Amino acid sequence: MNQSYGRLVSRAAIAATAMASLLLLIKIFAWWYTGSVSILAALVDSLVDIGASLTNLLVVRYSLQPADDNHSFGHGKAESLAALAQSMFISGSALFLFLTGIQHLVSPTPMTDPGVGVIVTIVALICTIILVSFQRWVVRRTQSQAVRADMLHYQSDVMMNGAILLALGLSWYGWHRADALFALGIGIYILYSALRMGYEAVQSLLDRALPDEERQEIIDIVASWPGVSGAHDLRTRQSGPTRFIQIHLEMEDSLPLVQAHMVADQVEQAILRRFPGSDVIIHQDPCSVVPREGKRSMLS
């Protein structure tokens, strides 16, 4: 695992924790001053943000540790556990928003000064957009599942802050139940994001194969190599930033072992150039044994 990956992922986790802490302080004041249930919803979400981002920070540092005798494949799955924990945090906040929104829908309470809430929400919106932009850049560079989960969480915050602005504006003109209705809508969106995030984390923990596009790229690389007659048993998975790729290459029976090994090494290097940092295992099979084993070439 390269140093660049660790540096970028750690910075993203630290930035998220710092931003969530700042926004929490701002929203505590805004809720105390206005009494807005939508701002209370945002405040609770910021509390969840801090817990999730702190979890991310600790887990990311653990996942960056190199493989050892007890963890031969590294600690990358810790990122998936962090994403799963985040989905649980977010689901809890969504439930709280439902209950609070229903309470204020039944008994609406006028806000003291919606103008202050509007200003605070605009500041929160700008700060969150900056953070999401940085996280998106980090995800493009690292493909970190933990940072991607955090980014999806803060993307929902952008939507939430936009909805809060609209709710505050409507409340300003006397639509006091709009505040509670938007809190319910925000809760639904947050719950959806949490379920999607949890599903992706579970799939990673269950060793889901790489996307079809990436597997096809691997097959195309193998098919383009001289000396390779076919291939079968492509197996892939991902743990943290590391892709694990296994494939059997079919070669002519008459090919010397040294040359077959050389071809396999060249294919491995080609795959690593396309997917840096991957763990690639290649097995060479004589063409004559493939039909007897009941295998079917992926290149035919």
Curated annotation (Swiss-Prot):
<dbReference type="InterPro" id="IPR050291">
    <property type="entry name" value="CDF_Transporter"/>
</dbReference>
<keyword id="KW-0864">Zinc transport</keyword>
<dbReference type="InterPro" id="IPR023783">
    <property type="entry name" value="Cation_efflux_FieF"/>
</dbReference>
<keyword id="KW-0862">Zinc</keyword>
<keyword id="KW-0812">Transmembrane</keyword>
<keyword id="KW-0813">Transport</keyword>
<comment type="function">
    <text>Divalent metal cation transporter which exports Zn(2+), Cd(2+) and possibly Fe(2+). May be involved in zinc and iron detoxification by efflux.</text>
</comment>
<dbReference type="InterPro" id="IPR027470">
    <property type="entry name" value="Cation_efflux_CTD"/>
</dbReference>
<dbReference type="GO" id="GO:0006882">
    <property type="term" value="P:intracellular zinc ion homeostasis"/>
</dbReference>
<comment type="similarity">
    <text>Belongs to the cation diffusion facilitator (CDF) transporter (TC 2.A.4) family. FieF subfamily.</text>
</comment>
<keyword id="KW-0479">Metal-binding</keyword>
<dbReference type="GO" id="GO:0015341">
    <property type="term" value="F:zinc efflux antiporter activity"/>
</dbReference>
<keyword id="KW-1003">Cell membrane</keyword>
<feature type="binding site">
    <location>
        <position position="153"/>
    </location>
    <ligand>
        <name>Zn(2+)</name>
    </ligand>
</feature>
<comment type="subunit">
    <text>Homodimer.</text>
</comment>
<dbReference type="GO" id="GO:0005886">
    <property type="term" value="C:plasma membrane"/>
</dbReference>
<feature type="binding site">
    <location>
        <position position="49"/>
    </location>
    <ligand>
        <name>Zn(2+)</name>
    </ligand>
</feature>
<feature type="transmembrane region" description="Helical">
    <location>
        <begin position="178"/>
        <end position="198"/>
    </location>
</feature>
<dbReference type="Pfam" id="PF01545">
    <property type="entry name" value="Cation_efflux"/>
</dbReference>
<feature type="binding site">
    <location>
        <position position="45"/>
    </location>
    <ligand>
        <name>Zn(2+)</name>
    </ligand>
</feature>
<dbReference type="GO" id="GO:0046872">
    <property type="term" value="F:metal ion binding"/>
</dbReference>
<dbReference type="InterPro" id="IPR002524">
    <property type="entry name" value="Cation_efflux"/>
</dbReference>
<keyword id="KW-0406">Ion transport</keyword>
<feature type="binding site">
    <location>
        <position position="157"/>
    </location>
    <ligand>
        <name>Zn(2+)</name>
    </ligand>
</feature>
<feature type="transmembrane region" description="Helical">
    <location>
        <begin position="12"/>
        <end position="32"/>
    </location>
</feature>
<feature type="transmembrane region" description="Helical">
    <location>
        <begin position="39"/>
        <end position="59"/>
    </location>
</feature>
<keyword id="KW-1133">Transmembrane helix</keyword>
<feature type="transmembrane region" description="Helical">
    <location>
        <begin position="114"/>
        <end position="134"/>
    </location>
</feature>
<dbReference type="InterPro" id="IPR036837">
    <property type="entry name" value="Cation_efflux_CTD_sf"/>
</dbReference>
<feature type="transmembrane region" description="Helical">
    <location>
        <begin position="156"/>
        <end position="176"/>
    </location>
</feature>
<protein>
    <recommendedName>
        <fullName>Cation-efflux pump FieF</fullName>
    </recommendedName>
</protein>
<keyword id="KW-0408">Iron</keyword>
<feature type="transmembrane region" description="Helical">
    <location>
        <begin position="82"/>
        <end position="102"/>
    </location>
</feature>
<keyword id="KW-0472">Membrane</keyword>
<dbReference type="Pfam" id="PF16916">
    <property type="entry name" value="ZT_dimer"/>
</dbReference>
<dbReference type="GO" id="GO:0015093">
    <property type="term" value="F:ferrous iron transmembrane transporter activity"/>
</dbReference>
<dbReference type="InterPro" id="IPR027469">
    <property type="entry name" value="Cation_efflux_TMD_sf"/>
</dbReference>
<keyword id="KW-0997">Cell inner membrane</keyword>
<dbReference type="GO" id="GO:0015086">
    <property type="term" value="F:cadmium ion transmembrane transporter activity"/>
</dbReference>
<keyword id="KW-0410">Iron transport</keyword>
